[in-house]
Structure formats: C-alpha cells, structure tokens
C-alpha cells in the first residue's frame, strides 16, 4: 500500500474504531502514512478536569512559508444499532462501488484523500515550495474541549504560523463540487427556568403554574424572527430543544419548569448583542399577564452555556479562488460559496488564519450504513491535488 491511494487510506482509517473519545488506532495509522512522506509528526494529548483525555496529531512537511494547513478529525460518532448495518461499521467493505463504514464521509474520507493528494504532489513535483501541515483531532464529535482548540494553542506556542487552512468536512449536499463553506453562523445556547408554586391541579388558585409562564417565554423567543438574513448568511433561527417540569404526577402543578434553547445566528449579531436581545424578550414576556391574569410577573432565571461559537466569514481571495477553480476544473461544477449548516472546528481555526471547508457529499454522515462512492474518493483527491498546486502558486500574490 502507498499513501497515494485514497481508497486504501480510508479503509485503513475506518478499520480503527475511533468513537469519541477513543483514539482507536486512527492517529497511529495516519502517522504511519505521513512519516514516510517526510512529515515530522507530533502526538499531543490534551486534558481538562471533568473531560476525557484526548489524543491529537500535528504533522508538518517543510520549514518555510507559505504554510497551508489541512484540519480535520479522526473521531467518529457511535454506530447506533450495529445489526441494522448491511456491512460491519468498521470493516470498510466495498459493495457496488461504495465503501461502507463509520467515518467514511465524516470525515476520515476527507483525510484519506488529502493524504493521497499530498503524496501524489510529492511524487510528481517534489515537496511544495513552502510547508503543509495536518492538524487532526480526536475530539470533534464530542465536547470539543481537548481537541482542535488546544492543539492550535499548543502549535502556536511552539511558533507555528499558518497562511491558510482547508477543513475536510463533508460540505456537499448532493454532488461532489456543490458547495464550499466560507463561513459559519454563530451558535449560542441557554437554559431558562421558570419558578412557580407547587399545588393541587384542582386548586390552581392556591398554586402558580410555571408552565404557563414558560409558554410565554418560549413563544417570545421564537416570534418575531430575529432577522431576515444578510447578504452572506441565512436568517438567525432559535429552536427550543428541551422542555422539562420534572413532574410524573398528573394531578400536581409543578414548582418549576425549564427549557433549553439554541440559536444559530448570522452577522447581524454578536454573542453580546444577542444575549441582550434574548433578555429583553424574556423580560417583556415575563410581565405579560395574558396567560397568567392577575398574577405577578413570571419569576425566571437563565444560565448561558459555556463556549458560544462566534459567526465568521472568510474573504481571502487567493484561498477561495484556488479551491473554487480546482473544484470546477476537476468536477465540472462551479461550487456555491455558502455559510449554511452547523458549526465545525473551523470556528477555532478562524482566529489563526483564513479557513474554508470542502470535502465529500454528506448525505449519509452519522447514519446507519454511512458510505461514500469510491469514484468520489478519486475525484476529491484530484481536487485536493489541484488545489495544493494552485494555492502554492497563488499564495505569494
């Protein structure tokens, strides 16, 4: 086996059961691919109290600039019901032109293809006039505390600097070449608790039902819309994700009700202005007596989740142009530049260098029978190889 073969690379990685937080041999397998290509490889273990230790990998080829980083993750989500899979989730079997396995799309496939692209570039043209690095974590699908964010800090403290980054997440909705992600919405979560007075359901005048107050509060969070979208981002959207009263009895008015929410927000907002708007809405709803006639304002408190994600947009023309032209020349498609979807580790990388995302088709990610077309692996490798050549050619412009 040589690292120039993306299919063999991916099969090797899939056969490593690296469900977060387990390394599962995946980083060791990647190290074995990169070291023969001339990469200096560091394994970095990160820890934080209350969270599992995580193994990460940083590898660099070259010592000079310009410096291109490829970022991704080898950890995968659980397989779910293994009996429902038509092929074992860690066997990496090929059937009817598709390679099956957990992580095939998200995102061991992207890593396998970029390794192959670098190997082919070296084989044909020698080492790039600059540096290429791999920044790979085992903690993207989990809490993302001991992963990319700490690996970036570790590398930066050692003097590492990057000019651009490509993240190999599965960005394409339907066909390879559909979409490049050039930014991401922000993400903010919180938990509201409404306090009432417990009592008998037959004697509501002696109690204060917090569910009524919670209905007011959650409605105020979702209506009216926060905005209508911007030139680069879709409208901000808030979803209530859990509601709980902790009360199994049908004849008891509960003492409190809680609800969690998450909002994905665009560049109309910052975390600070969004928190202020949410509090404004909650305070206004608390004093609305429509659902609680004759009652005092709703008593509530709110706890904000740690580590909100900030909105960002990449405007680096050389990076975007190099990738867009590579996608179009290989796939024949002109990719859409998009900021849709959820968050990724690009949210951490954007603080260090311009970052874009492009990988496989994401239709089966996290699903039973996650799989990728073998032909797509070859196409993505060709796109990455073309991108590498064009980025280094344009990086000094």
UniProtKB/Swiss-Prot annotation:
InterPro entries on file: ArgE/DapE_CS, Bact_exopeptidase_dim_dom, DapE_proteobac, Peptidase_M20, Peptidase_M20_dimer, Peptidase_M20A
Cofactor: Zn(2+); Co(2+)
Reaction catalysed by this enzyme: N-succinyl-(2S,6S)-2,6-diaminopimelate + H2O = (2S,6S)-2,6-diaminopimelate + succinate
Subunit structure: Homodimer.
Pathway given in the UniProt record: Amino-acid biosynthesis; L-lysine biosynthesis via DAP pathway; LL-2,6-diaminopimelate from (S)-tetrahydrodipicolinate (succinylase route): step 3/3
Similarity annotation: Belongs to the peptidase M20A family. DapE subfamily.
Binding-site residues, Zn(2+) 2: 106, 141, 366
EC id: 3.5.1.18
Protein name in the entry: Succinyl-diaminopimelate desuccinylase
Function: Catalyzes the hydrolysis of N-succinyl-L,L-diaminopimelic acid (SDAP), forming succinate and LL-2,6-diaminopimelate (DAP), an intermediate involved in the bacterial biosynthesis of lysine and meso-diaminopimelic acid, an essential component of bacterial cell walls.
Binding locations of Zn(2+) 1: 73, 106, 169
Record note on cofactor: Binds 2 Zn(2+) or Co(2+) ions per subunit.
Any one GO biological process: L-arginine biosynthetic process
Pfam families (alphabetical): M20_dimer, Peptidase_M20
Keyword Kinase appears in the UniProt entry: no
GO molecular function, one term: zinc ion binding
The entry's keywords: Amino-acid biosynthesis, Cobalt, Diaminopimelate biosynthesis, Hydrolase, Lysine biosynthesis, Metal-binding, Zinc
Record's signal peptide: none
Organism listed in the record: Rhizobium johnstonii (strain DSM 114642 / LMG 32736 / 3841)
Keyword Signal: no
């Amino acid at each position: 086996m040589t690292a120039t073969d993306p299919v063999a690379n991916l099969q090797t990685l899939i056969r490593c059961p690296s469900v977060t937080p387990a390394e599962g041999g995946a980083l060791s397998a990647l190290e074995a691919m990169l070291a023969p290509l001339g990469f200096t490889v560091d394994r970095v273990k990160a820890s934080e109290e209350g969270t599992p230790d995580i193994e990460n990998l940083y590898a660099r080829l070259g010592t000079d600039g310009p410096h291109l980083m490829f970022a991704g993750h080898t950890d995968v989500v659980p397989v779910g019901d293994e009996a429902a899979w038509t092929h074992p989730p860690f066997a990496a079997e090929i059937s009817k032109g598709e390679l099956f396995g957990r992580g095939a799309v998200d995102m061991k496939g992207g890593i396998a293809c970029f390794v192959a692209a670098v190997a082919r570039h070296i084989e044909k043209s020698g080492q790039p006039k600059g540096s290429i690095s791999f920044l790979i974590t085992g903690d993207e699908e989990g809490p993302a505390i001991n992963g990319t964010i700490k690996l970036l800090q570790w590398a930066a403290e050692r003097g590492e600097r990057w000019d651009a980054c490509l993240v190999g997440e599965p960005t394409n909705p339907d066909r390879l070449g559909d979409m490049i992600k050039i930014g991401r919405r922000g993400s903010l979560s919180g938990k509201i608790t409404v306090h009432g007075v417990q009592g008998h359901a037959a004697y509501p005048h002696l109690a204060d039902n917090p569910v009524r107050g919670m209905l007011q509060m959650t409605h105020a969070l979702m209506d009216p819309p926060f905005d209508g979208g911007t030139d680069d981002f879709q409208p901000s959207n808030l979803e209530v994700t859990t509601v709980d009263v902790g009360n199994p009895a049908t004849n008891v008015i509960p003492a409190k009700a809680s609800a969690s929410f998450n909002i994905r927000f665009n560049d109309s907002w910052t975390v600070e202005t969004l928190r202020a708007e949410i509090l404004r809405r909650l305070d206004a709803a608390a004093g609305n007596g429509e659902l609680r006639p004759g009652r005092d304002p709703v008593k509530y408190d709110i706890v904000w989740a740690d580590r909100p994600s900030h909105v960002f947009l990449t405007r680096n023309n050389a990076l975007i142009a190099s990738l867009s032209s590579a996608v179009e020349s290989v796939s024949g498609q002109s990719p859409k530049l998009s900021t849709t979807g959820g968050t990724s580790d690009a949210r951490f990388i954007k603080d260090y260098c311009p970052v874009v995302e492009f990988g496989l088709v994401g239709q089966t990610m996290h699903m039973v029978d996650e799989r990728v077309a073998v032909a797509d692996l070859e196409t993505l490798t060709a796109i990455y190889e073309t991108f590498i050549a064009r980025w280094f050619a344009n990086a000094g412009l």
